[in-house]
């Protein structure tokens, strides 16, 4: 995508389609995507959340048992909270996200928080509304 920003709603739709496509090739997981707040009025950089979702899919594929992935987006004022969690797979390690942290730092400076714990990724962003 050559745009600098896309609607959060479009990004959520893209991630939903990505998970549906992954599920076509492997019926090893189910997923749920939920969104609260004004996702149709907030802009974010394209593909901002994709690396987190890809990491969850990779971890699910690493296990021989059926798993699930949950994505939750919550917009409150000028804050976005994104939570990606999965119930099977290897445990996550914060060092796995060093390049993503670099991108977030370039985009948001100190206006973000990224937490990685076991099988959950939480990203909080403070955004500038146009």
Question: What function would you assign to each model-found segment?
Answer:
Residues 1-126:
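Two-component histidine phosphotransfer core
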